[in-house]
Amino acid sequence: MNRLAVELPGLSLKNPIMPASGCFGFGREYARFYDLSVLGAIMIKATTKEPRFGNPTPRVAETPGGMLNAIGLQNPGLDKVLEEELPWLEQFDVPIIANIAGSTVEEYVEVAEAISKAPNVHALELNISCPNVKKGGIAFGTVPDVAAELTRLVKEVAAVPVYVNVSPNVTDIVAMAKAIEQAGADGLTMINTLVGMRIDVKTGRPILANGTGGLSGPAVKPIAIRMIYEVSQAVSIPIIGMGGIQTAEDVLEFFYAGASAVAVGTANFVDPFVCPTIIADLPALLDDLGIGHISECIGRSWKTGAHAVHCRA
């Protein structure tokens, strides 16, 4: 028995570990270090209809507990992804989750319809939570009705299950998640980055050319866990959790909160081997805790009832 295997809509995962979109490109750089087939899945970089060159530099800044980025959805565009990147990934025994973005509803729908037909794309991740673009992205992800309508329209044309990336930059993430579920989403991915800023004390100006950027890394982990803990009790669709994961112990925290799989983001920049290391470490951790299968951990923190909370301070 594979103790790490996970079944999600459209995804039969050999293990629940995958690199998060935007932190792994299309896998080419990391394939020089290890066989990508060891991964549970790969969330490829966000794809838009036309190529995007992203925001001006500097667009990355370190913080004490992570990093800020304002990349701006830089990508080669739909045609190149379909003609070059996805065919290259076919050599690996790993399902692909295609992250899609756009400036308009029509762009999202067009990209979703086309990319979901690729033979190795098993699911879509609808990016409505990127805080670093002037059009699209988070503009679709902060109003429940807008997010729900976009989800519904993408579901109508997608040939594979649709997961929606939920923004933490909202007043009520539970209301947002429920609206997306009711619109037909097959799953959620959460959380994306939190909007932040750093200022250069010598110039008095923001370090990032964009001014603000998305905060990721260990600093956001407690926020991600709290949000997943709340949302997982309010919806019935699975959650792929992300936000500051670096170790096998982190993975179990996310599972206990209610995630059914996880994505590792910023840690890939620190250690390119972080994903295979976590995969290798998980069985021993399960042994130490007397857990037979990783699925036994899902929602353990609130299913016991001892610590369930349903309100915010």
Curated annotation (Swiss-Prot):
It catalyses: (S)-dihydroorotate + NAD(+) = orotate + NADH + H(+). The active site is at residue 130. GO terms for biological process: 'de novo' pyrimidine nucleobase biosynthetic process; 'de novo' UMP biosynthetic process. Its EC number is 1.3.1.14. FMN binds at residues 21, 45-46, 99, 127, 191, 217, 243-244, 265-266. Substrate binds at residues 45, 69-73, 127, 192-193. One of its GO terms (cellular component) is cytoplasm. Its main location: cytoplasm. Its cofactor is FMN. CDD domains: DHOD_1B_like. It is an enzyme of class 1 (oxidoreductase). Pathway: Pyrimidine metabolism; UMP biosynthesis via de novo pathway; orotate from (S)-dihydroorotate (NAD(+) route): step 1/1. Binds 1 FMN per subunit. The keyword DNA repair does not apply. One of its GO terms (molecular function) is dihydroorotate dehydrogenase (NAD+) activity. Keywords: Cytoplasm, Flavoprotein, FMN, NAD, Oxidoreductase, Pyrimidine biosynthesis. InterPro entries: Aldolase_TIM, DHO_dehydrogenase, DHOD_1B, Dihydroorotate_DH_1, Dihydroorotate_DH_1_2, Dihydroorotate_DH_cat, Dihydroorotate_DH_CS, Dihydroorotate_DH_I. The keyword Iron-sulfur does not apply. Catalyzes the conversion of dihydroorotate to orotate with NAD(+) as electron acceptor. Heterotetramer of 2 PyrK and 2 PyrD type B subunits. Belongs to the dihydroorotate dehydrogenase family. Type 1 subfamily. This is Dihydroorotate dehydrogenase B (NAD(+)), catalytic subunit. It comes from Bacillus caldolyticus.
